[in-house]
From Swiss-Prot:
It is a peripheral membrane protein. The lineage of its organism: Archaea, Thermoproteota, Thermoprotei, Desulfurococcales, Desulfurococcaceae. HAMAP family: ATP_synth_A_arch. Belongs to the ATPase alpha/beta chains family. Pfam families: ATP-synt_ab, ATP-synt_ab_N, ATP-synt_ab_Xtn, ATP-synt_VA_C. Component of the A-type ATP synthase that produces ATP from ADP in the presence of a proton gradient across the membrane. The A chain is the catalytic subunit. It catalyses: ATP + H2O + 4 H(+)(in) = ADP + phosphate + 5 H(+)(out). Keywords: ATP synthesis, ATP-binding, Cell membrane, Hydrogen ion transport, Ion transport, Membrane, Nucleotide-binding, Translocase, Transport. This is A-type ATP synthase subunit A. Has multiple subunits with at least A(3), B(3), C, D, E, F, H, I and proteolipid K(x). It comes from Staphylothermus marinus (strain ATCC 43588 / DSM 3639 / JCM 9404 / F1). It is found in: Cell membrane. GO terms for biological process: proton motive force-driven plasma membrane ATP synthesis. PANTHER family: H(+)-TRANSPORTING TWO-SECTOR ATPASE (PTHR43607:SF1), V-TYPE PROTON ATPASE CATALYTIC SUBUNIT A (PTHR43607). Its EC number is 7.1.2.2. The gene is atpA.
Length: 592
């Protein structure tokens, strides 16, 4: 619909509005509904009628109220000022809305996503007369002490630089260059549903180091990868996702709270301001973007919050940064889709979800990737996407979980039984998987330890064997097992409790460097190998359980993350010494 054409409301059904006299309107065009000019988006066109999903509360709308066309799609504002911001689902800055209308957002309130009056120190990197193309870097702004915000040519622009400003202070709407007669400003707009272009997709080679042992060591996630964290109520999805956002070794972290509790979002914001990034020594908020679309906000805006996060992530990816986007939770978005679909009277699919659930989820997850960007200088960037799924009753066979599993390449399945046992993170090592292991093996072997893959497979085999022995233990009891199996159960317990369990609220254990994780597993495996040797020499499991080094292994996660190599050397020596003295004692008794 071209700018200026006005339609009328024909029908209102919750967040869904049907307007008439809308001939010429386009799908996914933004409209303003009613006298309060509520933001909406056309999701379907039929004759002269347009089907609109409204991103604000529709209470009080009447048949015959005006609908104003804007002529453009829903677009994200991209430029300096994004980092550290808190937005709602349609990119309204929440701190500014609080100043304007208080704690409760009123209908029809509008605010610019990026400040127009703030001046940024711009440094040009191109000269007059140079040829430039899409996504070429023409300068940069020091947005935070951690993030250098590169100013890029819009993807639809190319030509010769006719004019470029000198170094100085400029707002995001001040012209900084002119290319073929077109003025370039620091602010860009990009439709949220349209993926940003890139030169080529590259193979995943590097892992996203999260500081969580169960993920980094057992089920690694590659940069540019896509993963899902499904889990029932109370299994720790939100805390796990917040941990990943806090400690992941990425340049930018985007946290999208999509239909979850407001208190959880508030908790995340408080902790991000307080915590320090171990890589840079600066506050975590200086590399983060927050999008809060809590459960009491309009359901239709859940979809835009997800796509807004992906668009901002792609923008920073195009600068050559590694970005992690976390969506908590995609199930709430799927529920919003189901509600809109029901009001549209579409044929329902499984459990009432629309038939296009899978393709809509794929359109989000497929925006991830490790890419070579357009433009000069040559650079690579990545967008890694991790989505929580909240299946009712922890039933992983429900449609949203199943549709997600067909798309993602890593699954971190949260287990209700583990959570009830206070085993956190409650990631079930028997169900979870990562298809990125082969991709990141070379990186682990070159940068961390050449024995990583072997250690990982040994540990997983022990945990698998423990699960097989559990049934037998229930029938005959642990004491009836052979000594080797008793040792295996003890080592499996050590892996579970001393390695996989990680305290998100412990000063040291909240984050574990990959090298420390490898040394921890080496300590457990050394205990297992020496234990097998001791059993062959006739030493009972009772004696092995009494060794002092068992207690030291249980406390190794509390070893500080700085200069831990010496502490582990000492631990390995203690384990060897304990077993040597045990074997000597056994030999002495045998001689007598």
């Amino acid at each position: 619909m071209s700018l200026g054409i006005t339609g009328k409301i024909y029908r209102v059904s919750g967040p869904l509005v049907i307007a008439e006299n809308m001939r010429g309107s386009k799908v996914y065009e933004v409209v303003e509904v009613g006298s309060d000019r509520l933001i909406g988006e056309i999701i379907g066109v039929e004759g002269d009628k347009a089907i609109i999903q409204v991103y604000e509360d529709t209470s009080g709308l009447r048949v015959g109220d005006p609908v104003y066309g804007t002529g453009y799609p829903l677009a994200a504002e991209l430029g300096p000022g994004l980092v550290g911001s808190i937005y709602d689902g349609i990119q309204r800055p929440l701190p500014l809305l609080q100043e304007l209308v208080g704690f409760f957002v009123k209908r029809g309130v509008k605010a610019k996503p990026l400040p127009r009056n703030k001046k940024w120190h711009f440094k040009p990197l191109v000269k007059q007369g140079e040829k430039v193309g899409p996504d070429d870097v023409i300068g940069y702004v020091e947005e935070t002490p951690v993030i250098k915000h590169y100013i890029m040519i819009p993807p639809d622009t190319h030509g010769v630089v006719e004019e470029i400003v000198g170094e100085g202070e400029y707002t995001i709407v001040d012209p900084i260059a002119r290319i073929n007669g077109k003025e370039i400003v620091m602010l860009q707009k990009w439709p949220v549903r349209k993926p940003r272009p890139y030169r080529e997709k590259l193979e995943h080679r590097e892992p996203v180091l999260t500081g969580q042992r169960v993920i980094d060591f057992f089920f690694p996630l590659a940069k540019g990868g896509k993963a899902a964290i499904p889990g029932g109520f109370g299994t720790g999805k939100t805390v796990t996702l917040q941990q990943l956002t806090k400690w992941s070794a990425v340049d930018i972290a985007i946290y999208v709270g999509c239909g979850e509790r407001g208190n959880e979002m508030a908790d995340a914001l408080h902790s991000f301001r307080r915590l320090v990034d171990p890589r840079t020594g600066k506050a975590l908020v200086e590399r983060s973007v927050f999008i809060a679309n809590t459960s009491n906000m309009p359901v239709a805006a859940r979809e835009t919050s997800i796509f807004l996060g992906a668009t901002i992530g792609e923008y920073f990816r195009d600068m050559g940064y590694h970005v992690l986007m976390v969506a908590d939770s995609t199930s709430r978005w799927a529920e919003a889709m189901r509600e809109i679909s029901g009001r549209l009277e579409e044929l329902p699919g499984e459990e009432g979800y629309p038939a296009y659930l899978g393709s809509r989820l794929a359109s989000f997850y497929e925006r991830s990737g490790y890419v070579k960007t357009l433009g000069r200088p040559d650079r690579t960037g990545s967008l890694t996407i991790m989505g929580a799924v909240s299946p009712p009753g922890a039933d992983f066979s429900e449609p949203v979980t199943q549709a997600t599993l067909r798309i993602v390449r890593a699954l971190y399945a949260l287990d209700v039984n583990l959570a009830y046992r206070r085993h956190y993170p409650a990631i079930n090592w028997l169900i979870s998987y990562s298809l990125y292991v082969d991709n990141v093996t070379d990186w682990w072997h070159k940068n961390i330890d050449p024995s990583w893959r072997e250690l990982r497979e040994k540990a997983l085999a022990i945990l698998q064997k423990e699960a097989e022995l559990e049934e037998l233990v229930r029938l005959v009891g642990a004491e009836a097992l052979p000594e080797e199996d008793k040792l295996l159960l003890e080592v499996a317990r050590m892996i579970r409790e001393d390695f996989l369990q990680q305290n998100a609220f412990h000063e040291i254990d909240t984050y574990c460097p990959p090298r420390k994780a490898v040394l921890m597993m080496k300590a457990i495996m050394l205990f297992y190998e020496l234990g097998l040797e001791a059993i062959k020499r006739g030493i009972s499991m009772e004696k092995i359980r009494e060794l002092k080094s068992r207690v030291k292994i249980a406390r190794m996660k509390e070893i500080p993350n700085i200069d831990f190599e010496d502490a582990f050397k000492s631990l390995f020596e203690d384990i060897r010494r304990d077993f040597e003295s045990l074997m000597k004692e056994a030999e002495t008794i045998a001689e007598l």
